[in-house]
Amino acid sequence: MFRTLMNAKIHRARVTEANLDYVGSITIDEDILDAVGIVANEKVQVVNNHNGARFETYVIPGERGSGVFCLNGAAARLVQKGDVIIVISYVLVPEEKIAAHRPKIAIMDENNRIVQLIAEEPAHTVL
């Protein structure tokens, strides 16, 4: 049996742009993607901390070092520039490997820079 577990999380990134006329997806700084192991075209869930919206889309790598988090297409209606979001990817893990699974979690600052990389959810609130 397989379980769906969190594989990567980008916590408290700020939306830098919303582009309604683009075909679709979320564009994320490729350095940040590399840090948490999310790849181009990977399906992700996006959670908007400002309005509670949750939606799925896929990832397009953005310019390295830019800090870009741009929601494209229809998803652009669910965010505004400056909103704080969480981006989560999931993976199917065989039951026998669950105990060894460690997600990669990037805690972001207000400029979309990684301030901490952790391998498990903290037991307290992280801002």
UniProtKB/Swiss-Prot annotation:
Enzyme class, spelled out: lyase
EC number: 4.1.1.11
Coarse class of the protein's main subcellular location: cytoplasm
Active site: S25, Y58
Compartments where found: Cytoplasm
Keywords associated with the record: Autocatalytic cleavage, Cytoplasm, Decarboxylase, Lyase, Pantothenate biosynthesis, Pyruvate, Schiff base, Zymogen
Modified residues (Pyruvic acid (Ser)): S25
Pathway: Cofactor biosynthesis; (R)-pantothenate biosynthesis; beta-alanine from L-aspartate: step 1/1
Family named by the database record: Belongs to the PanD family.
Role played: Catalyzes the pyruvoyl-dependent decarboxylation of aspartate to produce beta-alanine.
PANTHER family: ASPARTATE 1-DECARBOXYLASE
Subunit text: Heterooctamer of four alpha and four beta subunits.
Protein name: Aspartate 1-decarboxylase
Gene assigned in the entry: panD
